[in-house]
């Protein structure tokens, strides 16, 4: 361990790999507190679809950056990095170990490496104007929205598929906030780490992972995911960027009478599997991870391996 830098444990892996359980049990062992590294769990009222940890599952372990924003608020890697850095300082100063657990690769990467991310913070009045401008675009379909983006940021439009409404909206929002083009934004990575980091990943065969994902979607639906999405739509959040998350965007057409339920569920499972594949590609290609094979290691074996690495 490098005594000159704060020590943190980071647990990554694809959706449904078991990060929540491992992080909680590890926190019990090493006197830790957990910081969520998930871009969607920051939102209130989006509990089932984001697989948000329940109070019962927390089992007394403090969790941070969960349910802190409304669904119509925006959140970025910059804001995550700023909040997480403050939390790491606070947790460390109290003699505990920060454990960051999540699957949003850019968030994790921006935290542990020296990424220079642009501050998109705006005043409440400015944010209100941005939201009004975005609301004025709600009536546009995906192709029309994509064409709107291309009018002022052709480079971003070329790199974003028209059907990826969330990314298109993100590029438009960035322009509204900063008066700059997202395609021109520079993200600088220094080759030094901010922390003494133990980076742990959970992996398993694709067959096993996909089976776990399909099963988890069924459990989410049994626990009321459809009703959760209905309530968010009824509260006026349908057009928010947060509602483009997997688990929400697939069910909105059912609520609006544009798709049958069974087809939406199949889409939800497929999108979740595709997302998991992208997550694994990101972590394997962009980060140096110590991988633990969930199929051949029990929870206790994984915990023993991690604590051995710490010592």
UniProtKB/Swiss-Prot annotation:
Alphabetical UniProt keywords: ATP-binding, Magnesium, Nucleotide-binding, Transferase, tRNA processing
Highest taxon, organism lineage: Bacteria
Enzymatic reactions: adenosine(37) in tRNA + dimethylallyl diphosphate = N(6)-dimethylallyladenosine(37) in tRNA + diphosphate
**Signal peptide residues on this chain, from the entry's feature table:** none
Q: What is its EC number?
A: 2.5.1.75
| NCBIfam families, per database record | miaA
Q: Which family does it belong to?
A: Belongs to the IPP transferase family.
Provide the protein name.
tRNA dimethylallyltransferase
């Amino acid at each position: 361990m490098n005594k000159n830098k704060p020590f943190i444990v980071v647990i990554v892996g694809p959706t449904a790999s078991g990060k929540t359980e491992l992080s909680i049990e590890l926190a019990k062992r090493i006197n830790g507190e957990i910081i969520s590294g998930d871009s969607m769990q920051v939102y209130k009222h989006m509990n089932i679809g984001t697989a948000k940890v329940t109070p019962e599952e927390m089992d007394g372990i403090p969790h941070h950056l969960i349910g802190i924003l409304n669904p119509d608020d925006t959140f970025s890697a910059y804001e995550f990095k700023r909040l997480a850095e403050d939390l790491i300082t606070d947790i460390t100063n109290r003699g505990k170990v920060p454990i960051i657990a999540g699957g949003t690769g850019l968030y994790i990467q921006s935290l542990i490496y020296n990424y220079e991310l642009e501050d998109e913070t705006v005043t409440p009045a400015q944010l209100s104007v941005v939201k009004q401008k975005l609301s004025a675009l709600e009536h546009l379909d995906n192709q029309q929205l994509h064409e709107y983006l291309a009018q002022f940021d052709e480079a971003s439009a070329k790199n974003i598929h028209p059907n990826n409404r969330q990314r298109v909206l993100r590029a438009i929002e960035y322009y509204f906030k900063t008066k700059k083009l997202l395609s021109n934004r520079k993200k600088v990575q220094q080759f030094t780490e901010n922390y003494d980091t133990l980076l742990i990943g959970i992996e398993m065969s694709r067959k096993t992972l996909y089976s776990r994902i399909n099963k988890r979607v069924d459990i989410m639906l049994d626990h009321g995911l459809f009703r959760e999405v209905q309530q968010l739509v009824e509260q006026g959040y349908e057009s928010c960027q947060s509602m483009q998350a997997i688990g929400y965007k697939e069910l909105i057409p059912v609520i609006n009478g544009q798709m049958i339920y069974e087809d939406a569920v199949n889409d939800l499972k497929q999108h979740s599997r595709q997302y998991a594949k992208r997550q694994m590609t990101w972590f394997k290609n962009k980060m140096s991870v110590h991988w633990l094979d969930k199929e051949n290691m029990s929870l206790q074996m994984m915990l023993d391996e991690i604590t051995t690495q710490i010592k």
